[in-house]
C-alpha cells in the first residue's frame, strides 16, 4: 500500500533553519553561491507550508470525509491572491518500468481553478478520477505569524479503485494546496499530501462460483494406411484401443479435414486429436459427459470405451475473501484405476495484472455533446493510416505474479475408484484488494486460483518438475468435518513467507499428458458484512448463555432428582456442560460452606475427566484443593421416587447393580462388607449404562431392615489428601450415622440369598483398612 507522504518542506522551528544555513553560506567562497544565497533569501517570506490531516494514517473509503489543517508560516509580510486546496484522484501508466529503489515519475498537479469534475482521460496514459476544490483564503496581505486554515472535504460516493503504486503505474489520491502570489516569477507555491483510499468491496454479496468439471476420455490411436494395428498392451494405463470386427467396421467419411501432425492434449468435441487422451471442460456433468462421449466416438476411427471415462470436479467454496483468510477447495475424482501421488494436486494463487497505456476511450469531457476525440496509438503516416507499425512495442501488457502455492496428495480408493480431496490455500495478509474500476481498464489487478490435477499420478517421477519439495509452501488441509488437520500451518507463517522463488512454475506441468487444469477467479475485498453479523449474533448468544448458566450453577431445580440418567447414552441438558458417565445430585451441586468437613459420600473412582467448575466466590487454597478433588470423584445416583422404595429407612440406603463373581471388577480385591441381619450390605458401584435397576439372577428384592452407614473414602482419596494438604482423617463414621440416616439416596436394595456370595463394593468396618485400589 502507499504510505501518506508530504512533498513540501516541513520545519518546526523556522529560526533554526535560517541560522543553520548562514554558516554554510559563509564557508562558500564561490560567486555563484553568493548569488544563489541572495536569491534564496528573497523567496524566504514563507518558510513552512504543509498539509496536516487529522488522521494521517487512516485508510478512507468512498464517501468518507477527510478533515485537516493547512499550516502556513510567514516570516515576512507577503501579498497573496488566493489559497486553495483540492482533493483529486489520478491514474497514470508509465512507459517504462521503474526499477526498485528509484523514485517514480511525479504524478503532477492539474493546477488550480478547475473546480469540481468527474473522471476524464487526458491522454498519454494519464486519467483523472475526480476533482474537488475549496478556497481557504482570498486576496490580501499576510503579516508575520503562523496561519492554520481548517478544511473539510469528502470523497465521491461512487466506487473508486484502491490506491496502489508499482513499477508500471500508480493510482493516487492527493490533497494539493496551492498558494498564488501576484508576481511574475514563481507565482504559485504548492504542497501535496498523499491519501490512502480503499475500494468498498463487500464479499458477502458474491455467490460461490460454479464447479468446473473436466472429462478425460480415452481415444484409440488412428490406424495407419498399411493397416497395421498397435499391440493391445501399448500404453495400457492411458488408452483403450479396440480392433474393429471384420463384419461390422466403422467407416470414416472421406471429406473430413486432415489432422494436424503435432500432438495435442487439449481437444473439444468439434476437433480431431492424435493424443491418447483428451479432456473438455463442461458445466453439467450429466448431460455434457454423455454428449462428449458421442462426439468422440463419431470423430474417431475406432469406437472408444465408454466405461473408461475419468471425471475430475473442482469446487471453490467461496468467491470472495479477505486478506489473511483461508480459501477452501474441494476436488472429486472418478477414476478408472488406482492412483497414488503424493503431490498429485497443485493449487496456486496468483495475481494477474493488465496495464494499457492507450485505452480506447475518448479524450477530454464529452458531457457537452462534443465529438469524441480518440488518441492515436501510433503517429499517423503520410498515407493517413493510423495504428500501423512495424515495431514490437505494445500499448497493453499482461503479467502474472504467483502469491502462494499448496500441494495435496491424490489417492484413489481402489474399491470405489474415487477420491475426495479437501484442501485450502491461504490469502497473504499484504494482498491488496481487486482493482477493476479504472477508466478504460488502464490498470487492472485480478486474483485467480489455479487447480492442476495429475490424473496419471506420474508427476513426481520427473525430478525436473519438483526438485525442492521442502521449499514449497503447504497449505491447510481439512478433514471430513471441516476442521484443520495440518498442525504446522496453524499460524499461517509458512504460507506468506514463500514468495516468488519457492513457488513451482506450473506452465510446463500443464502441458504434460494426463494433467488437467482449471482456473477460478476470486475477489479479494475489504469487508464482509455477513461475517460481522454472525460474530455479533455469536457474541450475543454467548452472553445470553452465560446469564442463563449463572443461576443454574448456584441453585437446583426441584425436579432435578427425578431425571433418569443412563450413563453416556443420555444427552446433556440445555445450559449444562456435557459430562461423561456422571450425574450430579443436589448435594454435589450445592458446595458446602465449610469444605474442611466433607459430608459427601465418595464412590470408587471411575476413569474419565470432568471439567473443573469455576468458583463462585473467592476461597482459600485449601478449599480450592478440596473442590478440585471432589470433581475427580463420581457422583451420587439420582433419587428416583418411582423406582425407589417408599419407606424412609430404605430411602437412606445407597443402591448399585450387583455384579457377578466372574466380573473383572473382582480384581480390585474389595474387603468383605458388613452384614446386617445376616445379609450382606451393599456399597455404591459403577452405574450400569443400560439400566439403573439391574437385577442379578439369584438375588432377593427384600429390603434391609436397618440402614448401613455410608462408605468411607477409598485409599486413593486419602493418599491424595495426605500429599496435597496433609489433612487429618475424616470424622467418626458412627457419629455421622444417625445424623445422615435420612439424607442418603434411596433405591431398591438387591442382595444374594446365599451367604457365601459377596457383593462388590461393600462397606468396611471403622477399624478395618480401606480397600486397596489396583489396576
Swiss-Prot record:
Residues 262-278 have a biased composition (Low complexity). Residues 279-304, 697-709 have a biased composition (Polar residues). Required for the proteolytic cleavage of the transcription factor pacC in response to alkaline ambient pH. This is pH-response regulator protein palF/RIM8. SUPFAM superfamilies: E set domains. Residues 217-304, 531-550, 586-623, 631-650, 697-775 are annotated as: Disordered. Belongs to the arrestin family. PalF/RIM8 subfamily. GO terms for cellular component: cytoplasm; cytosol; plasma membrane. GO terms for molecular function: protein-macromolecule adaptor activity; ubiquitin protein ligase binding. One of its GO terms (biological process) is cellular response to pH. Gene3D superfamilies: 2.60.40.640. Disulfide bonds: none annotated. Pfam families: Arrestin_C, Arrestin_N. The lineage of its organism: Eukaryota, Fungi, Dikarya, Ascomycota, Pezizomycotina. It comes from the Eukaryota. Residues 710-723, 733-743 have a biased composition (Basic and acidic residues).
